[in-house]
Curated annotation (Swiss-Prot):
Its main location: Golgi. InterPro entries: Got1, Vesicle_transpt_Got1/SFT2. Belongs to the GOT1 family. Residues 31-32, 90 are lumenal. This is Vesicle transport protein GOT1B. The modification N-acetylmethionine is found at M1. Widely expressed. Tends to be up-regulated in seminomas compared to normal testis. The keyword Ligase does not apply. One of its GO terms (biological process) is endoplasmic reticulum to Golgi vesicle-mediated transport. Residues 1-9, 54-68, 110-138 are cytoplasmic.
């Protein structure tokens, strides 16, 4: 098992709560307050898990500036009160930022017993195969 420091454990909790609040905010018709809290918790949790320096290095790489602009711009737009537009920017930026991790995630999920069989369903399989391609990594 992977050994985590206390700071990383706090970061995992913050990230988990951030994802929960983002999901819950979208379920409740893009509630501004929940989405704003979720954004702040997610970004803070990421910084706690991988460290401040590595977080800045990840977000501000030269080839990821467009993705970072959309993601952080979306966070800002949500914080000023336009949740639907902000979430569209954020989701686009998130996919641009983290698309290099998708093949790894898809490969892992395919090995999980119940989820792996769900990913092999006819309508879902073609989409997951396209997302899981490793040639579109940045």
């Amino acid at each position: 098992m992977i050994s985590l420091t206390d700071t990383q454990k706090i970061g995992m909790g913050l990230t988990g709560f951030g994802v929960f609040f983002l999901f819950f905010g979208m379920i409740l018709f893009f509630d501004k307050a929940l989405l704003a809290i979720g954004n702040v918790l997610f970004v803070a949790g990421l910084a706690f898990v991988i460290g401040l320096e590595r977080t800045f290095r990840f977000f501000f790489q030269k080839h990821k500036m467009k993705a970072t602009g959309f993601f952080l711009g979306g966070v800002f737009v949500v914080l000023i009160g336009w949740p639907l537009i902000g979430m569209i920017f954020e989701i686009y930026g998130f996919f641009l930022l983290f698309r290099g991790f998708f093949p790894v995630v898809v490969g892992f999920i395919r090995r999980v017993p119940v989820l792996g069989s769900l990913l092999n369903l006819p309508g879902i399989r073609s989409f997951v195969d396209k997302v899981g391609e490793s040639n579109n990594m940045v």
